[in-house]
Amino acid sequence: IMPFWYTLKYDGKTKKPVVADVYKTANPSVPITEPLTALRNAGMTIIPTITDGTDQMILANLLAKPVSRKQVVDAIVATVASQNYDGIDLDFEGFAFIDPNTTWKATAPNWVLFVKELSAALHAEKKILSITTPYLFNPAEAQKGYFVYAWAQIAPFIDRLRIMTYDYSTSRPGPIGPIAWTEKTVKYAISIMPASKVYLGL
């Protein structure tokens, strides 16, 4: 199970990234220990999702500097340790939908370094690293998709890739996830990593 319980924020006072607990805000009268106990008693693997709650280019700039990149890593690892989660899922959509696509080439290598460093820290504690992103296509083709997420480069470091194979049509009526479109991104994904790592969001 992958509950949306956390979001990454930037604290302007401390000038540091923080992982904010949105579960507590939404459920002030129900301690998080209650659902955690129920889920664990049911034998569930618990991998919460962290969304990107920062403003335009904030996360990209944090990942561009070794010190602040490590701060992001440390904040995420501390969140996993706080409730002994089985791992974490990153749903950082700001690169795709908030930052200008002209920044993607500069952001991608810093994203790869971040994933590599986070992976090492989590795997040292035997935790799972899952990444959720919009679609990518083969970069050799004209239509590349959201190449900022650099699937081929992060593939060795992640345990799961969750592809957002939906929202094909947004501003106008149309299909949510056409089969040909979905198959194209899946074929690319399984050409660069084991199929066992690839999950579809429908």
Could you say what each language-model-derived stretch is?
Residues Y6, M44, T51-G53, E93-F95, ...:
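Solvent-exposed coil/turn segments that connect beta secondary-structure elements
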Residues G12-V30, A96-L202:
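Substrate-binding surface in catalytic domains of secreted glycosidases
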Residues M2-I76:
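Glycan-recognition patch characteristic of GH18 chitinases/ENGases
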Residues T37-A38, A78-S82, A120-A121, A189-I192:
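Surface-exposed acidic, glycine-flexible loop patches that form ligand/cofactor-binding
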